[in-house]
Amino acid sequence: MTPHKWFEWSSGTSELSLRGGNMETHTGQFFRKWLEAEGLFPVNYHPAEGEVRIYANSKQRTIATAQFFAAGLLPTANIPVEFHGEFDKMNPEFTPATTFLSPEYEEAVKNQIDEIYGERLRGLKDRYDLIKDIIDFEESEAYKSGTVTEFSLDDMEITYAVGEEPKMTGTLKAACSVSDALILQYYEEPDAQKAAFGKTLTQEQWKQVSEVKDLYNDVMFAVPLVSCNVAHPQLQLIRSELSQEGRKFSFLCGHDSNIASILTALQCEDYVLPATVENTTPIGGKIVLSRWTNEAGRQLVSVDLVYASAQQLRDLTLLDLKTHPVVVPLTLKGLEKNADGLYKYEDVLQRFDEAISEYDKIVEEYAEQEMDQAA
């Protein structure tokens, strides 16, 4: 879709890049310094069995991410990275797959997509035009051969199948791939003008480029009826880790699709991401749930989204307590925070339980509708 040559990536398709590995180690080092400062980890901590869990999806990029992060977090402990199943295949515990489906449910999902995202989907023309200009689309072989001649606003199709991730065809899917590649190129290429194939873009324009891939991810995974379905295993896993007796630290390494569906299922309110060109799921982002005990013995939980800023990623900045990643406090709809921005532990557990049980409600409601239709 472009006559230009892309940046020479340091890794294979869908694998963790060398820059990504460096940044994960830097992020792990930041968490080590923070945990030591808070008194949770001693210096050169060697955890006892069960105190720390590093668990990754079985894809190359998630295993590698966890390995690099663990090297920064516990550099002398030789902590194992846990993964299950065949290497470079999705583990069902991390796969955002549809596990319940009926015609009535699928129709309701598509109606909900239109209700929540329809206006934004219909307003993508400016973003598409910007991307086409950056990549010199009309000079590409795809355009000249007639393979792809336009970026349409009305050709999106999403299909669902039990045991599989949602699948999209149409312009948004193709434009998402270009948007994703441009943003990765922006992080990897030191010269921002080269990253935009000779164009000079403002930060706002980079955000508009990213909006295409971000909207794709939201449409696929951040729809309430979808999120409680595809995030069901991850919600159970996180809920278990948060209440695990004797556990000091858990690192669960999945994907941006997991972040989108988990936060939607937990009824997270909209948030703004400073210091990045991404809008909802920043590259390398981490949902961080920290459990605290106050002087009165009450347990409290903070919920944050933590990520390296765009400049930190581009500069491979060393992260520590003075030069730290961006921390965005998240708000769970309907739950009360105290003066320190913390939730009651039992309220957070209840929100997880509600999100987990929502799956059963969906199955019950739409299976019943299907039976009524059959009758």
Task: Identify the residue ranges that each predicted region occupies.
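Signature for phosphate-centric chemistry
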Residues: 1-53, 57-250, 254-375
